[in-house]
Amino acid sequence: MDSNKIKNLAFGARDALRAEVAARIDAVLEPGSPERLDQPDKTRQLEAAIKDRGMDSVVESTAYTWFNRLCALRFMDVRGYTPIPVVTPRLGATQPAILADAAQGVFDPEFGFSRLVRDRVQSVLAGGSGSGANRTEAAYGELLVAVCDRYAQAMPYLFGEAAASSLVMPQGLLAEDSILGRIVEDMDDEECETVEVLG
């Protein structure tokens, strides 16, 4: 394992994720934001966390949470611990396998996706509001949050909800130069040989 490669990934990702999370919090807390209308309880949770701990602390912990989740999911994908890859594309593809399957109407039963999640993902992919890229990002976000919720049952320390983290999930995860793309590239099969890559 190349510890310098992983260390560089962690330092670069931390700054990028902090900026992304801070921007998402600002957008979510705007008066009349879609999140305020659709998820008022989580929005209030987020506001309470900021009031209790301060904005910097919430940004830092949320960025840290998402970095750890994405790295853990990459490790689990490489090691075959997920029924289908959650953050990793299949060979020759560009989208994570879970999203490619969902676009075909296939939802692995091992993830236990609720009817509501499946319907929302299919509705968004079939032509909900926004551009094609935005719809794809929104559908992937739904899947990613549902997977984290599922794994939270067994690993709450890693995938449990913290300060409404699902509400401020980093955007642009499917972009070529995204933090997720860097994680997938830098945490290759060789790097994932040992669980130390997560430490």
Stretch-by-stretch model annotation:
Residues M1-G199:
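Preference for the N-terminal adenyl/adenosyl cofactor-binding alpha/beta module
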